[in-house]
């Protein structure tokens, strides 16, 4: 990397223990700093947030009276981006503000009056503020679409298209994604692509446990009794999630689900308790777990074999973040599931190990 980081960032890096750039951070830095339109693809847990934030903040610092807009598919991810951005931006004199659906619009309008250089939010709320003429897109030089594949899945792309329509014709547009499950030529033509989706996460170990379908909750209970164990458990269905939560709590296991009817505020409380190790198991579906970012999470458990290899990779990336050690355990109930799991492992070049743990 040619560009030298500001002294303030070098000091902050030492404080945070940020020692070296990951591959995606290294490869995105100069193109983003130069203002290129770019698609960056890298698995979950490889440092994509800082990969686009650091060069974009430096570029913004040099361009007075301009703004940076970051769109995320959900409130949790937007909040996490804001927290990271605030840490790095304020040391070089830049101010971020957060704009979420479900939060007080009046307060958000008051924040805009303070003239923040960085706007972070969900597409729906950002578009509402544009229509109210509270956000003036003529000042936005760079738009970053984080977890772009999820923005497509959530059908928020129509908001994104309307937002970009209001931006200056020569604005910089950056797509960040964990997968490439979309037609790039159709959606992001003539865009510089840096695709590290095949990057191996060698710091994550992968196991499977063969268990009778009726004993899967018992297996979770047994794992929860392992000393210092803490795991994020993924379910393919809400009905299995609800049933498992009820059975685990009945047996005094500290397990809580991110149910769809949990409001944003309480959801944040649950996540904080899990991060603080006050909960042993956090139960979720892929949809409910979007935006979860827990740096020190050591284990992901698949209650069911995921539907496809990309889902498996996305779940696995919740652990072993930024080079830390992690492991994934998948519960397998019959031979066809094991065959499917081994196919995922072959596609992703993962070493899959059988972990025997018998229910007593």
Task: Name each region found by the language model.
Residues 1-360:
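Conserved helicase RecA-like core
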């Amino acid at each position: 990397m040619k560009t030298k980081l500001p002294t303030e960032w070098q000091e902050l890096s030492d404080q945070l223990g940020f020692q070296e750039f990951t591959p995606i951070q290294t490869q995105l830095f100069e193109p983003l700093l130069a203002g290129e339109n770019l698609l960056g693809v890298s698995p979950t847990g490889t440092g994509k947030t800082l990969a686009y934030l650091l060069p974009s903040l430096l570029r913004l610092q040099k361009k007075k009276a301009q703004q940076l807009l970051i769109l995320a598919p959900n409130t949790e991810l937007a909040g996490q981006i804001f927290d990271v951005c605030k840490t790095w931006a304020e040391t070089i004199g830049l101010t971020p503000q957060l704009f979420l659906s479900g939060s007080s619009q009046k307060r958000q309008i008051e924040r805009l009056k303070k003239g923040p250089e960085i706007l972070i939010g969900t597409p729906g709320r950002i578009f509402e503020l544009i229509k109210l003429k509270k956000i003036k897109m003529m000042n936005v030089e760079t738009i970053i679409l984080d977890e772009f594949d999820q923005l497509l899945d959530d059908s928020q792309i129509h908001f994104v298209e309307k937002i970009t329509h209001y931006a200056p014709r020569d604005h910089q547009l950056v797509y960040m994604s964990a997968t490439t499950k979309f037609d790039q030529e159709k959606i992001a033509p003539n865009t510089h692509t840096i695709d590290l989706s095949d990057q191996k996460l060698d710091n994550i170990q992968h196991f499977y446990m063969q268990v009778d379908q009726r004993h899967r909750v018992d297996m979770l209970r047994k794992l929860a009794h392992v000393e210092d164990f803490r795991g994020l458990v993924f379910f393919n269905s809400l009905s299995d999630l609800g049933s498992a939560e009820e059975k685990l709590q009945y047996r005094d296991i500290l397990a809580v689900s991110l149910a769809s009817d949990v409001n944003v505020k309480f959801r944040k409380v649950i996540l904080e308790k899990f991060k603080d190790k006050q909960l042993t198991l956090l139960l979720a579906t892929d949809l409910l777990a979007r935006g979860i970012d827990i740096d020190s999470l050591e284990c992901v458990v698949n209650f069911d074999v995921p539907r496809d290899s990309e889902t498996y990779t996305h779940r696995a990336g919740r652990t072993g973040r930024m080079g830390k050690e992690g492991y994934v355990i998948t519960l397998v109930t019959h031979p066809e599931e094991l065959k499917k799991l081994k196919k995922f492992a072959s596609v992703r070049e993962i070493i899959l190990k059988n972990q025997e743990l018998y229910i007593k």
